[in-house]
């Protein structure tokens, strides 16, 4: 979950930071292995956080204690996932199959004057350590700029923007292609009377 300052600046409802923590808790509870009940905060010093609390209220309050209003270093997040796997000798098949980057997409660059994206850089580092970079869902919960963390047609990446139950269902059911989204919208009851 992006805990950088820009996640608090938006006047939208719900606030991007609230969405980020909610989704982080949801996905963390469904993780397995070394990442079970963990999520990563990210700004300049990302942390792998084990979620604590008896109920959703306690879990959210606990997660809020890790909010750091600083810059957003997405590369440090990829490095933390990789170093955790290496440290725990996680088998490749026990790695998370998908990473959800819940953010407003205002990331720092991974390297100055670099010709590679943060994603390409991470993919190479994972491969150097015997792992495949998990599929990545960049979920923009507060679009203010036209920033994109990957180039068009990048394999293994899904870009999602917005915050509503339909988008949540599509992401969790793994129906995130533009074509599937279009069909989902067009097949709604409100368009049933339209004939071609």
Task: Go through each PLM region and give its residues.
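Acidic, glycine-rich A-domain
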Residues: 1-196
